[in-house]
Swiss-Prot record:
The lineage of its organism: Eukaryota, Metazoa, Chordata, Craniata, Vertebrata. The keyword Nucleotide-binding does not apply. Pfam families: DNA_binding_1, Methyltransf_1N. This is Methylated-DNA--protein-cysteine methyltransferase. Its EC number is 2.1.1.63. One of its GO terms (biological process) is methylation. DNA binds at residues 99, 118-119, 127, 132, 155. It comes from Cricetulus griseus. Keywords: DNA damage, DNA repair, DNA-binding, Metal-binding, Methyltransferase, Nucleus, Phosphoprotein, Transferase, Zinc.
Length: 209
């Protein structure tokens, strides 16, 4: 748990401003936007370069992997599909809860170039009536971008809120992935079957615990 972990921190410079990463030897704990930088309307900015607080030898593997993943994401998001994800060791991943189940399902199922509604994600997590609880899980996501809560939208097609950095950041991330932010209603997007991959399959990420 967080209180017993020896935490390490690093700051990553991105087109969205500074992003703080924190983790321990057992896994990544958090990704946090530090600055309220208004993202450019054009996501094709200069590649991000990480700024490390402390030498690379001081960083646990989880932070090294997360830095590598984010650097690839901001340069070419599709390239992240072949990269390993860090182990996750935030307390939310150490207990059996609906929030953990929702976040894990989102990470495994909703891939690059895809979106899902809150209600659809609730169904994927085993409770189709829990759309509001899914919204709470998105607000409590400790590792935004890595677990792509920006790909979860409202059933009416609006993109909804984004606690990771505000609606402008959510729009930027979707545009960066080549997803139009002005969409028809979610039920018309063909998200089940055609836009979403089957819930089976494997992922290279792992929960540490």
């Amino acid at each position: 748990m967080a209180e017993t972990c020896k935490m390490k921190y690093t700051v990553f410079h991105s087109p969205l401003g500074k992003i703080e990463l924190c983790g321990c030897e057992r896994g990544l704990h958090g990704i946090r936007f530090l600055s309220g930088k208004t993202p450019s309307s054009d996501p094709k900015e200069a590649p991000a370069s990480p700024e490390l607080l402390g030498g690379p030898e001081d960083l646990p593997e989880s932070l090294v992997q997360c830095t590598t993943w984010l650097e690839a994401y901001f340069q070419e998001p599709a390239a992240t599909e072949g990269l390993p994800l860090p182990a996750l060791h935030h307390p939310v991943f150490q207990q059996d809860s609906f929030t953990r189940q929702v976040l894990w399902k989102l990470l495994k199922v909703v891939k690059f170039g895809e979106m899902v509604s809150y209600q659809q994600l609730a169904a994927l997590a085993g409770n189709p009536k829990a759309a509001r609880a899914v919204g709470g899980a998105m607000r409590n996501n400790p590792v935004p971008i890595l677990i792509p809560c920006h790909r979860v939208i409202c059933s009416n097609g609006s993109i909804g809120n984004y606690s990771g950095g505000g609606q402008a950041v959510k729009e930027w991330l979707l545009a960066h992935e080549g997803i139009p932010t002005r969409q028809p209603a979610c039920k018309d997007l063909g998200l089940t079957g055609t836009r979403l991959k089957p819930s089976g399959g494997s992922t290279s990420s792992k929960l540490s615990g």
